[in-house]
Amino acid sequence: MKNAARQKDIILLTIDCWRYDSPSRMPRLQAFTEDYDRAEATCQAAATNGVFPSILASTYYPEAYNDSGALHRDVRSLPEVLSDQKYATAGVIGSNPYLGKWSDRFDVFWNDGMNAAEESTNRSEYTNVHRMWNLLRLRPRVTAGEVASRGRKWFQHTSSPKFLWMHLMDLHGPYHPGLRRGLETGLFDAFYSIVQHSRHGRDAPSEVLETIRSLYWECVSKLDEQIAKVLEFIPEDAIVVIMADHGEELYHGFIGHARLYDECVRVPLFVKNAPQNMDNQLVRQLDLAPSLLDWIDVPQPNDWEGMPHSSDREQASYMINHSPLFGGTFTGIRVKNHKLIKYPNKDEPAESEIYDLIEDPAERNPLSDSSVKEELEDRLNKFLQQNNINHESLTHQTGIGGKTKRRLRELGYL
């Protein structure tokens, strides 16, 4: 089966902030993907900057970036491996300042003007007038429709085999679901809550936070209305992967993505035309790129951390997320039935919590004492020590320059 799939086109669609429970509210997506395998993925981080080295290069992000925030030149990425196999490659990104660093790994790359290898040199002609105009229309900066249009144009004018990566930002805060859906929430409440949340974050009044949560779900419904435009041009025999880069925390006292609850690090995964059955599997993002290469019978680079997914093998999912907003680094380990999360605690030793994911899937009640906690804490500490991962090194690797900070603030990272 692998040889028959060797020259198949490959489409990777990633959706920013797409929660694991979102597909149940997306009937059009469900209908369009009726013949897809439906799985879930575990993320190696809780935010865009941390997850894409695992998705595109099967590498934990502290090993992927230099101190300026750029990719190390020797990081071997999926599009580069496919290019060596005579694939044409393109990335179409719905405006994310953290993803410009991948631009030189693709033949063609569009990211709303943010294509520089280092975030600090990224520019985008987007003024306060544009920002206010889109707020008044409750419209995202780049819509799924625009990403689809650019992706379709490249795809239809490029010879096979080809690899297309599209990244949608429609679910990312600030949540702009369009005027029609804003009316359902109440336009005044929508505008007021977006402004208040941007100013005060989790300290905003409870009614503001409730409106913000409602706007997120309206954005999910809005994206569902557009999803056919994103997928309709893809040929029937192509290998297709639809996955979130990370989820979105809504119900643990914070709205956004930084901490390692399953709201952020367990995400939907839809797969079409894979040579193996992926239904109901739980796949590490670290193993996605090796799996894609395995499906087309191409060996993976020796220095990749992951391996082709196998339902017969349980792999621990390690997680690392440095959050400028929280001023610290969250780390964790997720196994089949349990998850351990270590929280930054300023100058004090990190605190940890462990959850039983079977009895407490919403992660509301950390176990008070557990032999499993000690075992997982030992495994996590060994992983961090072996990979020389610490708070100081991750702080330097953010690579955020002044020209990028405005966009990052707009997206809620700072």
What is the role of each PLM region?
Residues 1-414:
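Catalytic domains that recognize anionic headgroups
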